[in-house]
Amino acid sequence: MPEIREIPVPDGAPAPLPEPGVDELRLETVLGALSDPLRLEIVQRLLLEREDFDHTCGWFGFDRPKSSLTHHFRALREAGVIRQRQYGLERRSHVRTGDLEARFPGLVALVAAWTPPAD
């Protein structure tokens, strides 16, 4: 598994959208957000397929309405799993790896290593 590390914040990046602080992260809220298969896939792909920059929801190539994706990304942000920044009309996201590891050691590695059950 590749090394999972925090994405550096570029100079001049906009402030993050509202999110819970590290000490406000609750395990049941984080696990609730990750219990949706699409959200789990979003987080896993952000962890494993990312480069050193934030990604828009279009990067994933999901065949879903934009309103549906917006809902899922908002749920992940409000649970404290991802951080989003507004760049013009785009919202770009990355996983809050450092914050999640500080609060729930080992959780990020579990999500990264997860494989769906065979159907």
Language-model regions, residue ranges each:
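Short linear functional motifs in flexible/disordered or boundary regions
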Residues: 54-55, 72, 112
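Canonical helix-turn-helix DNA-binding module
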Residues: 58-81
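Conserved acidic functional residues
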Residues: 36, 72, 105
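Short amphipathic alpha-helical "recognition" segments used for binding
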Residues: 7, 68-70, 94
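N-terminal helix-turn-helix DNA-binding core of bacterial DNA-binding proteins
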Residues: 29-65, 87-99
